[in-house]
Amino acid sequence: MDATLAFDHAISDMTDDAYIIELIPSFEDFYRTEYPGLVAVATALVGSHEAGEDMVQDTMVKSLTRWQAVQRLERPGGWAHRVLLNACTSWWRRHRTEANHLARLRRVEPTVSGPSPDALAFWGAVRRLPERHRMVMVLFYAGDRSVAEVASILSVPEGTVKSDLTRARAALAIQLGE
């Protein structure tokens, strides 16, 4: 779903309070700017475009309900990414528990569908990285964020992000046999 349609759909689900209407112009710009990148990050982290869009919608609802405070932040997009990363972490915990339970019940391995075998292998390898390395890789590559932006979102020094990227790339090279 493109950002415009998603925004219109999200707003149509809300009440017509004058308070919300006052907030919409600045929030709408934020939504249109951040939505595509947030979807890319969520999709890369959870491996499902639909689940990623759901998490981004939840993130945007949280952003709108707190918009007066969020819009005053130096980097509202960084705040939204942090909220999204927390949602993705929760999703992984839930999914891992559910997948393990289903695998025991059915005695089959859970599968993840994707666009191509290479993409599945790559993003599967990324998802097996330690959490911080996974988040750094996804924010930097799928989220198209700079080292400084990733550092700000994760509240770590830039040097830590660079180190994590180097370690994550090395781990991926080993996992993918390159």
Where do the PLM segments sit?
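DNA-recognition helix of helix-turn-helix
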Residues: L85, T89, L154-E178
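A short, charge-rich alpha-helical start-of-domain segment used by transcription regulators
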Residues: F7, D16-A40, E50, L64
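C-terminal flanking helix
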Residues: Y35, V39, M60, P130, ...
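A short pre-motif secondary-structure segment
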Residues: V136-F140
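Internal acidic/polar
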Residues: L5, S90, E98-V126, S146
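Arg/Lys-rich amphipathic alpha helix in sigma70-family domain 2
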Residues: T65-Q71, R82-R104, P115, R167
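C-terminal edge and immediately downstream basic/flexible tail or linker adjoining helix-turn-helix-like DNA-binding
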Residues: D2-A10, D17-A18, S26, L102, ...
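Structural recognition of an alpha-helix C-terminal capping motif at a helix-to-coil junction
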Residues: D54-V61, E74-N86
